[in-house]
């Protein structure tokens, strides 16, 4: 049996709940190596289990979001709070005890429940429509936040001081008793007297100590000698996990969107002789450098944590030719140079369109926004000046020659690629999920760096500078034979990077160690 331990953590206190109201954009995408690898095991009917260390009251709806609802899991905080496994259950706020004269004020973002002239409660919802927080205000001052579990439990209450800062948090049992009191100022955790016999201490310096104690007890009952644990590498939990699981049973997964680089602290938190799984050339280089520095020889494998799965592409059915451009991971100077090239290129034909892809809409520089507006206005003015064209056009027909597509989740990538004729990624480390998705869609890729997933002149072009962009674009846009060859080559790669093959590579890494012992 394989066990997966993710790092779906808060940036400040890693054990705290990460759920936010649906309208708050996440700084990073949720989809990661753990979600993908578990999905592959589920798809292939292989046994696996999830172990969650942090407080995750909305775990079930989170798993459902990524088609992992059937995943078996163990939760440290479920053990602490005595919560049992059952299906999500939305809270009907109408059934709660409100004053007779309560007024419900509906807004696009929250529900405001006015209970008196000086008090009101705001109810916040997840993207699935579940109530996640009730926040009580007195004289416009936040007093308490009630944190709800997606199974219908009241999971915790956070209290705020007179300055509106979080003061302490109580974690509740299924019966509504306080089992843990966490001081949010100094981090200390106190176990309520009624439950102290379940713990080795009555007080802990921080929640991480208590979590490690409960984790140790959990794995002593669940994990056996032949089992293997795949851990999302994170310096905040690596050492605690390694303290209780033998190195031969451990693999650490390094994922570029989580581990941009490997620090000394993170590498030293990894137990000697554990396996290492990496998804990028840069992370592999970082780890090799650390291995040489500390004279270690951890077995390592570089694989994609994302599977290929053939997806539709309708670019040949469209009148316009859509060119996708990944703009993340580039310096301002390089991005400006590339955009100038591309703007000049699409001016050659009226049917060329640019779709700029980014995970970080708020980080798009002002000059680029102005460039997009200017090019679009110039194009529309040209269309309006053409009497024959403008006579046939309605306001709905006026389209933009350059558009921005924000990638909130990985399905946004798949959706964007449906209409693209090809995709460009000139960043120093081409986005892995974009490459795998382009293979799945069968479209050519133009990259500025050599990778395992793009073969020059086969399913794409590898160019050294943006000066070569025109030739690379012409190669696929002017010659259908070249595009068709890239499509056929991508179909072959779909088999190579299918989920069963990725799992086989993982098993070879794990079983190789077992054979050696």
UniProtKB/Swiss-Prot annotation:
Which InterPro entries would you find in this protein's record?
Answer: Accessory_SS_Asp1
An individual GO BP term: protein transport
Q: Pfam families under this entry? A: Asp1
Q: Which gene encodes it?
A: asp1
According to the record, what happens upon gene knockout? Answer: No effect on cell growth, significantly reduces export of the cell wall protein SraP. The small amount that is exported seems to be glycosylated normally.
Q: Which organism is it from?
A: Staphylococcus aureus (strain NCTC 8325 / PS 47)
Q: What is this protein called?
A: Accessory Sec system protein Asp1
Keyword field contains Transmembrane = no
Q: What does this protein do?
A: Part of the accessory SecA2/SecY2 system specifically required to export SraP, a serine-rich repeat cell wall protein encoded upstream in the same operon.
Assembly mode:
Part of the accessory SecA2/SecY2 protein translocation apparatus required to export cell wall protein SraP.
The UniProt keywords, alphabetically, are: Protein transport, Translocation, Transport
UniProt lists the family membership as follows: Belongs to the accessory Sec system protein Asp1 family.
Asked whether the keyword Iron-sulfur is assigned, the reply is: no
């Amino acid at each position: 049996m394989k066990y997966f331990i993710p790092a779906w953590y808060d940036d400040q206190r890693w054990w705290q709940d990460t759920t936010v109201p649906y309208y708050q954009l996440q700084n990073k995408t949720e989809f990661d190596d753990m979600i993908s690898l578990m999905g592959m095991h589920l798809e292939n009917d292989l046994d696996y289990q999830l172990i969650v260390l942090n407080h995750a009251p909305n775990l079930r709806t989170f798993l459902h979001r990524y088609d992992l609802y059937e995943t078996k899991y163990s939760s440290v905080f479920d053990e602490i709070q005595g919560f049992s496994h059952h299906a999500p259950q939305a809270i009907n706020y109408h059934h709660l005890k409100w004053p007779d004269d309560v007024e419900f004020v509906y807004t696009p973002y929250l529900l405001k429940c006015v209970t008196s002239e000086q008090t009101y409660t705001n109810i916040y919802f997840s993207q699935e429509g579940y109530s996640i927080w009730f926040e009580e205000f007195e004289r416009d001052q936040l007093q308490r936040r009630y944190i709800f579990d997606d199974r219908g439990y009241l999971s915790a209450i956070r209290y705020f001081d007179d300055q509106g800062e979080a003061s302490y948090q109580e974690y509740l049992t299924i019966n509504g008793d306080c089992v843990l009191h966490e001081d949010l100022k100094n981090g200390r955790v106190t176990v309520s007297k009624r439950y102290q016999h379940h713990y080795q201490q009555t007080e802990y310096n921080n929640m991480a100590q208590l979590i490690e104690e409960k984790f140790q007890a959990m794995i002593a009952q669940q994990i056996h000698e032949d089992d293997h644990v795949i851990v999302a590498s994170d310096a905040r939990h690596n050492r605690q996990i390694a303290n209780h699981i033998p190195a031969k049973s451990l693999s650490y997964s390094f994922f570029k969107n989580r581990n941009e680089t490997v620090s000394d602290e993170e590498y030293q938190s990894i137990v000697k002789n554990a396996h290492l799984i990496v998804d990028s050339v840069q992370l592999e280089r970082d780890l090799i450098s650390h291995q040489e520095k500390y004279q270690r020889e951890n077995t390592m494998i570089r694989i994609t944590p994302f599977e290929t799965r053939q997806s539709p592409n309708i670019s040949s059915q469209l009148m316009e030719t859509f060119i996708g451009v990944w703009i993340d991971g580039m310096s301002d100077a390089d991005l400006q140079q590339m955009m100038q090239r591309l703007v000049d290129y699409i001016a050659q034909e009226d049917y060329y369109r640019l779709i700029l892809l980014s995970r970080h809409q708020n980080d798009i520089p002002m000059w680029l926004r102005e460039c997009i507006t200017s090019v679009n206005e110039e194009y529309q003015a040209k269309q309006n000046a053409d009497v024959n064209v403008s006579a046939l056009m309605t306001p709905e027909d006026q389209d933009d020659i350059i558009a921005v597509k924000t990638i909130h989740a990985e399905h946004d990538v798949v959706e964007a690629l449906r209409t693209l004729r090809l995709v460009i990624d000139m960043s120093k480390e081409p986005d892995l999920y974009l490459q795998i998705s382009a293979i799945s869609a069968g479209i050519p890729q133009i990259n500025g760096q050599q990778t395992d997933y793009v073969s020059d002149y086969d399913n794409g072009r590898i160019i050294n500078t943006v000066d070569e962009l025109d030739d690379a674009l012409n190669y696929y846009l002017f010659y259908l034979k070249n595009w068709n060859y890239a499509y056929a080559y991508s179909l072959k790669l779909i088999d190579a990077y299918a989920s069963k093959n990725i799992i086989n590579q993982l098993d070879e890494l794990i079983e190789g160690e077992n054979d050696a012992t």
